[in-house]
Amino acid sequence: MTCYLRKAKMDDCDLLFEWANYPMVRLNSFSTKPITYDEHVNWFRNIMERKDCVQYIYMEGDKPIGQARIQICDDMAEISYSIIPEKQSLGHGHEILSDICDEVWREFPNVTKVVGKVKPDNIASQKAFERAGYEEVCRVYEIKKNDINNPN
């Protein structure tokens, strides 16, 4: 069945809220705490009004199976994406990452690169990015103020 991206509508708010709180989505997110409904609604309204962000729903026929969001900053687009659990490990990750590039190049001609950030233990997403033609260009290291191993 053919898969494609469509722009999100306000009606997608509850669906995206459900997906955002899937345990694996929270685990692979850079912000792992659960999201409250009020937080999500406020965030979603903001995203839908912004000119530098576009939220997409990834469709398989008439069934939503994932989401992708881009945020534009000058000549760069940063992507965030997820696929519903029952459709993971079927190749949809690299497909959505390829499709989002096509959307970015068409909608934002000034953008020259698309960037995705992946946690070190999210091997499936790393492989999806690589299979879609992205290449790893750096690693980011951080230390938090109250980390036990912080020597300061």
Region locations from a protein language model:
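Acyl-donor (CoA/ACP) binding surface of acyl/acetyltransferases
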Residues: 1-15, 19-20, 55, 59-152
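Charged, low-complexity, helix/coiled-coil-prone segments
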Residues: 2-4, 36-47, 69-72
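Hydrophobic alpha-helical core bundles mediating ligand binding, dimerization, or RNAP-core interactions
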Residues: 16-21, 40, 44
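Residue-level marker of structural boundaries
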Residues: 22-25, 34, 49, 88
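Conserved GNAT-fold acetyl-CoA-binding loop/helix
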Residues: 24-42
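A short hydrophobic/aromatic micro-motif that marks alpha-helical segments and, especially, helix-coil
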Residues: 27, 36, 51, 146-148
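A short helix-loop-beta-strand connector motif used in the catalytic cores of GNAT acetyltransferases and
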Residues: 45-57
